[in-house]
From Swiss-Prot:
Keywords for the protein's UniProt record, in alphabetical order: Flavoprotein, FMN, Oxidoreductase
PANTHER family reported in the protein's UniProt record: ANAEROBIC GLYCEROL-3-PHOSPHATE DEHYDROGENASE SUBUNIT B
MF terms (GO), sorted A to Z: glycerol-3-phosphate dehydrogenase (quinone) activity
Official protein name in the record: Anaerobic glycerol-3-phosphate dehydrogenase subunit B
Function: Conversion of glycerol 3-phosphate to dihydroxyacetone. Uses fumarate or nitrate as electron acceptor.
Gene label: glpB
Lineage: Bacteria, Pseudomonadati, Pseudomonadota, Gammaproteobacteria, Vibrionales
Amino acid sequence: MNFDTIIIGGGMAGLSCALRCLEAGLKTAVIASGQSALHFSSGSIDVLAKTPSGKHVINPMDSLETFSKEYPSHPYAALGKETVERAINWYKTTLSAIGVPLTSQKDGLNHYRLTPLGTMKSTWLSQPFVHQFPMDLEKNKTQKMVLITIDGFRDFQPKLAQDNLKQITQLSDLEIATASISLSAFNDIQRNHCELRSIDISRLLSKRANRQELAYALQQHANPGDLVVLPSIFGNGTGLSYLREIEQLTKLTLCEVPTMPPSLLGIRLEESMKHAFIELGGTMLNGDHVVQGEFSYVDKSDPEHSHYRLNRLFTKNHGDFPLQAKQFVLATGSFFSQGLKANVDSMIEPIFGLDIAQSDKRTDWYSHDFFSTQSHPFLSMGIKTTANFQAIKSGHVIDNLYCAGAILSGYNPILEGSGSGVAISSGFHAAESIIEQLQCSDSLQNNNTKAEVAL
């Protein structure tokens, strides 16, 4: 099979890159081995919440230029402010067009979102029913919050969230109540309702009668003007419309919080992007993974300074039938997604054996304290690339293999709150670079053809 672009990895970076390539008319394939980290995500888009030194960032876009000068090895420094802004705005527009509107504060500031543990986390874009608390919590206008769960649901504990919220001094005037709701639909299932996860409950709530029962129960515990916090139990596709329906029935203000995995807020993003990719004509190879790539030298006359070129891939499911493309993108994630692996004394990129930016001593990989405020150094390690995010193998640049997302080195997405921002921006940048190269190549071919005809 031949493509213009093959993207390895079906997470945020890979799908962002794939959608942009399809927009430009490129024949594109995505190879996804399984569930991405989006199944464990909040469903909000973090651009930059903290600097590596731990300083809080209030306005991420305005901070990017200074941030890039202070941390020149960070992916944002290589991308530049203009590219990051274009990428995030493009993503926001794209997701809105496919049914998942994302909004930020009008003044461009980060906002706080509520976590299932009752803490506040800084982010930049959130989905429609994720309540945006101001960064200055003393300006919070909500007077009463009602934390409500489904009876027996284990992945959201209102009492725990309530206790943690009461520890936030800026919210000392906020009245916080909790409640648990039971659904009669539990009587019709054969499983113990305490075993149900968010996906199971979302299936029950796909029936209008069950949603109406939920709406009535909510009205027994809250009044208009209250902020009603629910675990994310409404799936993709019709999930947002169900929430709007319940809000209209109850006249309550609803707030979704991500649950312990699986997170339907994150799944909503992934499934929406995958659906759009397939609808636009993309090829999705689910449940497959690349086992090796076939390379060639660009300049054999000077092996020491020669570049590599990736010609084709072999995957587990396709066996001896290779997948060929003009350009490739590696977006397989970090250790969590097995895009990187660690041995006793070294880290490896398991597909192509790419060069890794890592410390030689294993003792330098981690901090002495497990819960260190500075996090662990291994979280900032990843693939060595050029400034244009082209991969490097044995010291040689691979001209047509770009890297994007958590596999990149030089940043700590967990500490910084920059994971989604880097994923989207680097995926978008890879797509833009590929589009430019292929358009130049096609233009050159057309000019050569015209010249031959003229002769």
